[in-house]
Amino acid sequence: MPLKLRGKKKAKSKETAGLVEGEPTGAGGGSLSASRAPARRLVFHAQLAHGSATGRVEGFSSIQELYAQIAGAFEISPSEILYCTLNTPKIDMERLLGGQLGLEDFIFAHVKGIEKEVNVYKSEDSLGLTITDNGVGYAFIKRIKDGGVIDSVKTICVGDHIESINGENIVGWRHYDVAKKLKELKKEELFTMKLIEPKKAFEIELRSKAGKSSGEKIGCGRATLRLRSKGPATVEEMPSETKAKAIEKIDDVLELYMGIRDIDLATTMFEAGKDKVNPDEFAVALDETLGDFAFPDEFVFDVWGVIGDAKRRGL
């Protein structure tokens, strides 16, 4: 069925359409649970993170389809959406929408705001930042390390989308390709990044570094909608505490070796190894599932160690 904002509204510009009209602005409000969706008809509520009325989205099976529905509900282009957070309009990297969506989660879409171009002097081999992406072609900064090269450039913030590096457009690149590009930049040389920060409400916020805790927290004990790149979305139970901790540890290994965080990739790796009996079988499974990554042997062994620990604790 076509998506629309709740209630009748007159046509508005993008600027005035952001006014909240009689709907709660976050989780816990009355409308979030007012109409529980019947079987096979899952309805989610959404807002633009900088402020808007509440929209309803349903019937999507992938991140791309979800973005298209959110865009239709708010009369914007899907390409305007940088990423979404769950149950908070803040730029909270621990609340990013990935491949799993709780059935009662409230979606906040962060859209393009101010463009900026920054020059960075690469004084160290490591820039001190972690990259992730939204699954549909936009890479952005998930974490900035205290005291690192990027930390010294105060105009660069967590949540900024990286549009180009030294004039090369990287829209459509996956996070690992962007991280590799940045890593390969020559030391002791200046480089330029074009960034787009998410549009913000009229409030003053401190520059966020996203903390030192793990990425998106994987909850336990409730149902979730699992979005897939191929095939229909499925409703699943949230993982056990042991499995959730193992996936977060794999995400830590991804950050250590590749400079990225991706809870969905970590989940895929865990699923590929949970029924394997040795690291050789696991390596073969990774090649079959994620062959494009060409993971080094030491990385595979570290991930296998995490999975082995989880097995010993009981999944």
From Swiss-Prot:
Main localisation: cytoplasm
Gene3D superfamilies: 2.30.42.10
An example Gene Ontology molecular-function term: identical protein binding
CDD domains the UniProt entry points to: GH2_GIPC, PDZ_GIPC2
Tissue occurrence: Expressed at highest levels in ascending colon and at moderate levels in adult kidney. Expressed at low levels in adult pancreas and at very low levels in adult liver. Expression is down-regulated in several primary tumors, such as kidney, colon and rectal tumors.
Region (Disordered): 1-34
Subcellular location field: Cytoplasm
Entry annotated with the keyword Iron: no
Biased composition (Basic residues): 1-12
Keywords associated with the record: Cytoplasm
GO cellular-component term (any): extracellular exosome
Disulfide-bonded cysteines: none
Organism superkingdom: Eukaryota
PDZ domain span: 117-197
Alphabetized Pfam families for the sequence: GIPC1_GH1 (PF25083), GIPC1_GH2 (PF25082), PDZ (PF00595)
Keyword Ribonucleoprotein appears in the UniProt entry: no
Family per record: Belongs to the GIPC family.
Subunit details: Probably interacts with SEMA5A.
Record protein name field: PDZ domain-containing protein GIPC2
Organism: Homo sapiens
Originating gene: GIPC2
